[in-house]
């Protein structure tokens, strides 16, 4: 699936122009890659926010730059640490027929039998590297943990193959495990050492 983002070209200098754009609710950005020279652009922050909210970060974003209609992926976004405002975004122009690699979120599905029995869920990977043509890139990878008992674990190798994409993360990497809940050790009675004052010789 792809969505359209309206962008406009911008000047690189003066530097104050970028701050002015941000003040107006716009985001300075750059697009580069397949069949396009590195080009500075800008767009309305609310437009990209809506795309990410409704379609995710791995969706193909169409835009028109220098009279060309191109397909892009958002490759990097710089956010303000305190406000979350977009400060700068990089878009990678892609060939829709060539394989592209991205990170996809690991989404756990269900409640494991082991957790219901008192175990603890330990998730070791939160994203995995996947490869696919841009139109087939997944936003997330679903992992069903319903049947996991205490002591069970799932690795990348345990995931079913998917016809649309390939998972490139090491097959031996552990995704999730169900471990016994840790309990605080109880103090044994009588183990506390009592201090006695030495008897004084009369």
Curated annotation (Swiss-Prot):
This is Large ribosomal subunit protein bL25. PANTHER family: RIBOSOMAL PROTEIN L25/GLN-TRNA SYNTHETASE, ANTI-CODON-BINDING DOMAIN-CONTAINING PROTEIN, RIBOSOMAL PROTEIN L25_GLN-TRNA SYNTHETASE, ANTI-CODON-BINDING DOMAIN-CONTAINING PROTEIN. InterPro entries: Rbsml_bL25/Gln-tRNA_synth_N, Ribosomal_bL25/Gln-tRNA_synth, Ribosomal_bL25_b-dom, Ribosomal_bL25_C, Ribosomal_bL25_long, Ribosomal_L25_dom, Ribosomal_uL5_bac-type. Residues 182-202 are annotated as: Disordered. It comes from Enterococcus faecalis (strain ATCC 700802 / V583). Residues 185-202 have a biased composition (Acidic residues). Part of the 50S ribosomal subunit; part of the 5S rRNA/L5/L18/L25 subcomplex. Contacts the 5S rRNA. Binds to the 5S rRNA independently of L5 and L18. GO terms for biological process: translation. GO terms for molecular function: 5S rRNA binding; structural constituent of ribosome. Keywords: Ribonucleoprotein, Ribosomal protein, RNA-binding, rRNA-binding. Belongs to the bacterial ribosomal protein bL25 family. CTC subfamily. Signal peptide: none annotated. This is one of the proteins that binds to the 5S RNA in the ribosome where it forms part of the central protuberance. The gene is rplY. GO terms for cellular component: cytosolic large ribosomal subunit.
